[in-house]
């Protein structure tokens, strides 16, 4: 019987220390929930991509403190280890991948500010109560809005620097939504988001909540009904 992917992560973890140990430990926790029974010979790029491009942007609040580089360095070390010891081919991540993860983290932070997300940190949980009050007041105005949409969307166009054109997955509906210029400057065509939208009495659309934001390179996983 082949070794399990998670047992190989634990095997590799014994060789790590310091920051790399912390990063690989996070990768083990992630993998034990999603790839618990997967054998090492079934490992592929998506195991790494889901961790780097779907899990990390939800957890890392400061993309400029070097943490993302540490995660990518640790994952590259692990990828090299399984290439050399188990003949499993997983691509090495590059500076482009680092910049893309940072971009997504930056977009998440901009949306938190734009939508009055009161959560400053998830671990430990820290909430800004002034922002919480603003968010609560905003949501009490829902009675004045005529229509809502929620689900996965792909970003199709950036319009005039303050609107984006979204296409709802599975239905194909196009919606033009107002955004902050700081957000418009960071997003790219092809990005994927899971969001709640509402239409105001003047028939323009706006964001209510952003639940998830992903780079286009995980679109195939979203289409396969992978949720994180």
Feature-to-residue mapping (PLM):
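N-terminal DNA-binding module of tyrosine recombinases/phage integrases
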Residues: 1-9
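Non-catalytic DNA-binding core/recognition domains of DNA-processing enzymes
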Residues: 12-84
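Charged, alpha-helical interface segments at or near domain boundaries
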Residues: 57-58, 62-134
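Structural detector for short beta-strands of small beta-barrel domains
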Residues: 121-124, 131-161
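Short nucleic-acid-contacting surface segments enriched for D/E, G, S/T with interspersed K/R
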Residues: 145-149, 179-196
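OB-fold (S1/OB) nucleic-acid-binding surfaces
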Residues: 155-176
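Extended accessory and catalytic-adjacent subdomains in large enzymes
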Residues: 163, 172, 179-186, 202-214
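OB-fold/S1-family single-stranded nucleic acid-binding modules
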Residues: 198-228
């Amino acid at each position: 019987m082949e070794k399990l992917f998670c047992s190989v992560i634990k095997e590799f973890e014994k060789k790590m220390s310091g920051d790399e140990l912390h990063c690989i430990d996070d990768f083990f926790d992630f993998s034990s929930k999603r790839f618990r029974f997967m054998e090492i010979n079934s490992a592929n790029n998506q195991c790494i991509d889901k961790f780097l491009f779907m899990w990390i942007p939800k957890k890392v609040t400061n993309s400029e403190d070097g943490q993302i580089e540490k995660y990518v360095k640790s994952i590259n070390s692990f990828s090299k280890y399984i290439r050399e010891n188990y003949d499993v081919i997983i691509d090495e991540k590059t500076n482009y991948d680092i910049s893309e993860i940072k971009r997504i983290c930056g977009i998440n932070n901009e949306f938190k500010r734009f939508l009055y997300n009161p959560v400053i940190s998830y671990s430990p949980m820290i909430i800004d109560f002034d922002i919480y009050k603003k968010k609560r007041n905003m949501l009490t105005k829902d009675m004045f809005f005529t229509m809502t949409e929620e689900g996965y969307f792909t970003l199709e166009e950036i319009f005039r620097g303050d609107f984006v054109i979204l296409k709802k997955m599975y239905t194909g509906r196009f919606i033009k939504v107002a955004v902050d210029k700081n957000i418009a400057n960071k997003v790219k065509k092809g990005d994927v988001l899971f969001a709640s939208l509402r239409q105001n009495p003047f028939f323009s659309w706006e964001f209510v909540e952003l639940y998830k934001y992903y780079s286009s390179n995980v679109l195939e996983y979203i289409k396969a009904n992978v949720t994180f």
